[in-house]
From Swiss-Prot:
Pathway assigned to this chain's UniProt record: Cofactor biosynthesis; riboflavin biosynthesis; riboflavin from 2-hydroxy-3-oxobutyl phosphate and 5-amino-6-(D-ribitylamino)uracil: step 1/2
Residues the entry annotates as binding 5-amino-6-(D-ribitylamino)uracil: 26, 60-62, 84-86, 117
Cellular component aspect of the GO annotation: cytosol; riboflavin synthase complex
Name of this protein: 6,7-dimethyl-8-ribityllumazine synthase
Keyword Hydrolase belongs to the record: no
Record key words, sorted: Riboflavin biosynthesis, Transferase
GO MF annotation, one: 6,7-dimethyl-8-ribityllumazine synthase activity
Reaction(s) catalysed by this chain's protein: (2S)-2-hydroxy-3-oxobutyl phosphate + 5-amino-6-(D-ribitylamino)uracil = 6,7-dimethyl-8-(1-D-ribityl)lumazine + phosphate + 2 H2O + H(+)
InterPro entries: LS, LS/RS, LS/RS_sf
Source species: Verminephrobacter eiseniae (strain EF01-2)
Protein's job: Catalyzes the formation of 6,7-dimethyl-8-ribityllumazine by condensation of 5-amino-6-(D-ribitylamino)uracil with 3,4-dihydroxy-2-butanone 4-phosphate. This is the penultimate step in the biosynthesis of riboflavin.
Family: Belongs to the DMRL synthase family.
Residues at which (2S)-2-hydroxy-3-oxobutyl phosphate binds: 89-90, 131
Annotated EC: 2.5.1.78
C-alpha cells in the first residue's frame, strides 16, 4: 500500500551483493523513474555500480523470462522486476498483472532467489507517478534485505 508503515529493518548492507534488474519499457516514463530510484537506493545501500546489471524488455509479460535467464546464470544474489501496468478498459490489465506477478513469484520459489517485485499496478497515470520513486527505492531495499537474509539462513 502506498505510504504504508513498512516497519524497519536492521542496517541494510549491499556491499558484497550482485543485483539483476529487469525493467519493462512499456510506460517508460514511469519505469525509467522506478529504475532511477531503485538504482540510486542500491548505490546508497553500498551495492557497487559494476555489480548492478540492468536489462530492458518490451513489457511486463516479458519480465519473467528475462528474470529466469538471470536466475539460471547463478550470478546474482537478488533480482528486481520493474514495470507499470495501468488499467485500461479491457480485461488485458488483469491478465498482464496476474500473469507477470505469478511468473515473478514462481521464479523466486523455483530458483530460491529473492525477487523484489516492483511491477506496479494502478488505475491511472496519476497513481503511477505518485508511487514511482517510493516503489523503486522499496524494491532496492527488499532485494538487499532478502539477499542478506537468505545468505544468513544458508
Amino acid at each position: 500500500m502506498f505510504g504504508a508503515d513498512k516497519g524497519t529493518a536492521d542496517r541494510l548492507d549491499g556491499k558484497k551483493l550482485h543485483i539483476g534488474i529487469v525493467q519493462a519499457r512499456f510506460n517508460s516514463g514511469i519505469t525509467n523513474a522506478l529504475a532511477a530510484a531503485c538504482c540510486a537506493e542500491l548505490l546508497a545501500l553500498g551495492v557497487q555500480d559494476k555489480h548492478i546489471m540492468q536489462v530492458q524488455v518490451p513489457g511486463a509479460l516479458e519480465i519473467p523470462v528475462a528474470l529466469q535467464a538471470m536466475a539460471e546464470r547463478n550470478h546474482y544474489d537478488a533480482l528486481i522486476a520493474l514495470g507499470c501496468i495501468i488499467r485500461g478498459q479491457t480485461y488485458h490489465f488483469e491478465l498482464v498483472a496476474n500473469e507477470s506477478g505469478a511468473g515473478v513469484t514462481r521464479l523466486a520459489l523455483d530458483y530460491q532467489i529473492p525477487i523484489a517485485n516492483a511491477i506496479i499496478t494502478v488505475e491511472n497515470l496519476e497513481q503511477a507517478i505518485a508511487r514511482q520513486s517510493e516503489k523503486g527505492a522499496d524494491a532496492a531495499r527488499v532485494a538487499v534485505e532478502m539477499a542478506n537474509l537468505l545468505d544468513a539462513l544458508s
